[in-house]
Amino acid sequence: HSQNNCLPVMACRPAPVQISGIGYINTTGLPMVDYFLTDEICMPSVYDKGGFTETPLRLPHCHLCYQPETMREIKSVGHNAPAMERGYVTFGSFNSFAKVTDEMLVQWRNILQAVPNSKLVIKCKICSVPSGQEMVRQRFKRLGGNPDVLELRPFSPDYLTQYGDIDIVLDTAPYNGGLTTCDALYMGVPVIALRGKTHGSRYGASILTAAGVPELIAENLREYTGKAVQLAKNGMLLNRLHRELPEQVRNSRLMDGKGYMQELEEAYRQIWALYCQQG
């Protein structure tokens, strides 16, 4: 149901067993799609199917494997947090602004008000035009925020290097970031994510767990705000994360291509065996 999808092809069932997953976080609604790829954090076994027509195909670890170096030449290295030199904390969000709810903007407002002199960089396609930037500023102002603390940046191909300007990334909810969260961690920037009750709202928790930083997961809005403020005020911890995260992420489950493929292929074997038994 997203742009340029292949649902008409899937509806013709070109394969005897069909799976949807990664990139699209909801059900297809097609009975021809048998499974939905997920994991034990995004869709725990204790949960029901939650409206999915597909059977959950759960991997024991994150159902996403992040392999940026196969697509980009940039290499991440540890560095000091920007706040160490600037003297103030810069929060950031590089997600699509369509994911930013009023409820989340209010939390960002509260975080900025609790951290003196802090700024928020919002980088997205809508900020590529003056009318889009004005909409963002007016919306933030309507919710009680000070638009002067916002730095609005347009989408650009060098977005990875721009993480070097960010101290802490604030994830969106209930539609979490996926690739943007991975990118931030890879570039050494901690991400505060809120765990919800659906696959799409638990994506951030799955990624952060796989990256080895589950302490950055918040279970409610108050904790989300609290974790962001506490980290912003703990310069030693913030700087340590910036210096150590790149190597930690490269050695984590999130980027373990071999381990990921072993788990995925085992899942394939199980559902194929089941198909053959039922065939």
What is each residue range found by the language model?
Residues 6, 156-159, 181, 204:
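Acidic, amphipathic alpha-helical patches
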Residues 12-77:
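Active-site-proximal region of nucleotide-activated glycan assembly enzymes
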Residues 5-9, 107-110, 180-183:
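A short acidic, amphipathic alpha-helical/loop segment
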